[in-house]
A protein has these predicted regions:
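Short, structured active-site-proximal loop/turn typified by the sulfatase FGly-forming signature C/S-X-P-X-R
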Residues: 21-76
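Beta-strand elements within well-structured catalytic alpha/beta cores of enzymes
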Residues: 4-20, 35, 60, 124, ...
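His/Asp/Glu-rich, glycine-adjacent segments
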Residues: 63-219, 372-425, 444, 458-459
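Short secondary-structure boundary/capping segments
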Residues: 23-27, 145-150, 215-221, 264-271, ...
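Secreted, luminal/periplasmic, and some membrane-associated catalytic domains
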Residues: 51-52, 76, 80-109, 241-249, ...
Length: 527
């Protein structure tokens, strides 16, 4: 009989691994330190692309990455903000804002997953008690807090930037744990079966709020992490008093890290000189470009002219993008001229979900353009990628400077775990595997550009949203590598995992529960 009967997956938003384990070393996170010293820990857990809340949390909770969600086992969420081309005119998807139909779009995310994947709550089995506390990626949850949109509004009001912000955020942290404990203490109140939940999701978003306002180096950000450590300690202590700790595994991780930019840029010159017009479903339905989001990574959507329906947005061909719009501009050249842009990625024409190519470009320090191609083949567990730089001496991600990574630049196809082992310690870890998965999703942008974090733009669907310098999204390790702790019950072995990926967490928890993962899961159990 399986000893472990309950699993709690806790995501602390916006925590980079190096800082997390440094705070543990300094003695500032004593409860996390205890989990580290008695359970499984990993200092090199690689997140998804791009390193923003969505899709990374979706990938954690489903154990898979994105792709062509219509035809292959994967999830369907490419980014936090994207353009839904299934409609004519297309609709904005922005999980942090109101949508075109004036509904809170975060509630749409469970539908956007598609039905070729499952959340961990679904994987534990029908009829089981499951809980989700402030985590909106919760398909399969028996109980979800906040229970109504009105309570969600009140919760968001609690998290506003006010003079009492710190107090309210600490209150929010405490509430997450208290709600979780109440599901164990008074299960009859929340579930049809009077049993504690077998699987639960927790999301602490307060750390992300403070990082964007003050940066991860600020005392208020670190103080908040210390408070989360405190309430996790309360969770462990109370579960022990209730008699549940010996049969409960607790996983602690983050969705992404963060970085500090030096400057906020302006895209006005790019737009004006290119003759492009921002699309808006109401104000400018005939616009031909949508910048879904651009902080350090920019996601650019363009409307093809090869369609008789003037409101429909098919993906344009690359030849059309080389001579685009009324001015006939080469969009690829123009995007590489944006201040601070160093990298660019796009699909080749004729790609399918089974095979295709992704074209990569890097502008080096001499403004010379370096090129490479990622070939992909297969889907699901058969998916593999091959990385071929045009010049073997100068590759896009600088992998050839490191022996393990350079060994995979051999003109052969390699698996996700081969790329993980070779690149987890580098900038742009796993990118050769993750970029084609992203572009296979028809919801993904036509062209993606990236700075190296020195300059950011803060554009969401064509509008500038803020001027903050504290960000996350790019492929540098500080944004792409997160911590992982798995502990609680003494049944968890004590061991350090040298490297892993965020999609390994769910299959590990399922293995401890004696459950099998869904066919879409690309992660592997760490035990």
């Amino acid at each position: 009989m399986n000893v472990i009967k309950h699993a709690i997956l806790c995501i602390i938003d916006d925590v980079k691994s190096t800082q997390f384990f440094h705070l543990i070393k300094e003695g500032k996170l004593p409860n996390f330190k205890k989990l580290m010293e008695t359970g499984i820990f990993c200092k090199n857990c690689v997140t998804d692309f791009p390193s923003v809340t969505f899709p990374t949390q979706v990938s954690i909770i489903t154990g898979t990455s994105t792709g062509d969600y219509r035809n292959e086992p994967c999830h369907g969420v490419p980014a936090y903000n994207w353009l839904d081309r299934d409609f004519a005119p297309p609709r904005f998807r922005s999980y942090g804002t109101y949508g075109t139909d004036e509904k809170i779009q975060i509630y749409k995310i469970n539908d956007d997953l598609g039905y070729n994947c499952q959340t961990v709550l679904e994987m534990v089995g029908d009829g089981e008690n499951t809980a989700s506390i402030t985590q909106f990626i919760n398909r399969g949850a028996s109980y979800f807090y906040p229970e109504s949109k009105m309570k969600l509004v009140l919760y968001y009001l609690l998290l506003r930037n006010t003079p009492r912000l710190e107090h309210y955020l600490l209150t929010a942290n405490t509430m997450v744990v208290n709600k979780m404990l109440d599901c164990f203490k008074r299960s009859r109140k929340y579930f049809e079966k009077n049993e504690a939940p077998i699987a639960s999701l927790l999301w602490f978003m307060t750390s992300d709020i403070l990082m964007h306002l003050y940066g991860s180096k600020s005392e208020i950000y670190k103080k908040n992490l210390m408070h989360i450590d405190k309430v996790i300690g309360i969770l462990i202590e109370e579960l022990n008093k209730l008699g549940f700790l010996d049969e409960t595994v607790i996983a602690i991780t983050s969705d992404h890290g963060n970085y500090d930019a030096k400057k906020v840029g302006n895209l006005s010159n790019f737009v004006n000189q290119s003759g492009l017009t921002h699309y808006h479903y109401r104000k400018n339905p005939l616009g031909n470009m949508d910048i879904a989001e651009f902080t350090g990574i920019g996601m650019f959507n363009f409307k093809s002219s090869d369609n008789q329906n003037q409101y429909r947005w098919d993906h344009p061909s690359n030849s059309e993008l080389r001579k685009y719009g009324l001015k006939g501009v080469n969009v690829f050249d123009k995007l590489l001229q944006i201040e601070g842009v160093k990298l660019m990625y796009h699909r080749s024409d004729g790609n399918t979900y089974k095979n295709g190519r992704i074209q990569l470009y890097k502008k080096n320090d001499e403004n010379h353009i370096v090129k490479a191609t990622i070939f992909y083949n297969g889907n699901g567990h058969d998916y593999m990628t091959k990385y071929v730089p045009d010049n073997p001496e100068e590759d896009i991600f600088n992998y050839n400077s490191y022996e393990r990574a350079a060994h995979l630049l051999d003109g052969k196809f390699h698996s996700i775990n081969e790329w993980l082992e070779a690149t987890y310690h580098l900038d742009y870890p796993l990118y050769v595997d993750l970029l084609p998965r992203h572009f296979k999703n028809p919801r993904a942008a036509d062209i993606i550009v990236s700075t190296k974090g020195t300059i950011v733009y803060h554009v969401k669907h064509g509008k500038k949203k803020n001027h903050g310098l504290h960000c996350h999204d790019i492929g540098l390790r500080e944004s792409s590598v997160v911590p992982l702790l798995i502990g609680g019950t003494q049944e968890v072995p004590h061991m350090e995992i040298p490297f892993c990926k965020i999609t390994d967490i769910v299959p590990t928890l399922l293995a401890m529960l004696g459950k099998k993962p869904h066919i879409s899961v690309i992660g592997k159990s760490l035990i």
